Regions:
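Intrinsically disordered, low-complexity acidic Ser/Thr-rich regulatory segments
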Residues: 1-67, 130-136
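Forkhead-associated
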Residues: 46-121
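Short loop/turn motifs enriched for small/polar and acidic residues
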Residues: 38, 81, 127
Length: 136
């Protein structure tokens, strides 16, 4: 007589499945995407997001670690999805995420706009390298 657990199976999932995967070439090779800390405890730090993908902003952890006590452990996510497809997403943070002074849940962001998390002010910078112009 079969045991009562014969119908149950265990499946082990690959730990890497939940991690965001970065796609090569998602941002044009001649474009650089950065986030600069403009105010707060980490003022002056710059993070390169040019590879594209998703970056977690968090207190002392994550892809963009900040030493701001008002920033949640997993506060927000910056998504670089392609040319001019940049988003900021609040990750159910305690103190909220603000884009240009307005509280947001998920919002597209442009170069030069300001993102506030806790007491830290971040600015997204998109630099497109100029190409030489042929002489006429």
């Amino acid at each position: 007589m079969p045991g009562r657990n014969d119908h149950m199976t265990t499946t082990r999932l690959d730990e890497n499945l939940h991690r965001p995967r970065l796609k090569e070439g998602i941002v044009p090779a001649d474009t650089r995407v950065y986030v600069r800390v403009m105010a707060g405890p980490d003022k002056g730090k710059v993070f390169d997001l040019s590879r594209g993908g998703s970056y977690v902003v968090g207190r002392r952890k994550g892809d963009i670690p900040l030493s701001d006590d008002k920033v949640s452990n997993r506060h927000a996510e910056l998504k670089i999805l392609g040319p001019e497809a940049y988003f900021v997403v609040d990750l159910a943070s305690t103190n909220g995420t603000f884009l240009n002074g307005r509280r947001i849940d998920r919002q597209q962001v442009q170069g030069g706009e300001e993102i506030r998390v806790g007491d830290s002010l971040l600015q997204l910078s998109v630099i497109e390298q100029s190409r030489p112009v042929s002489k006429a």
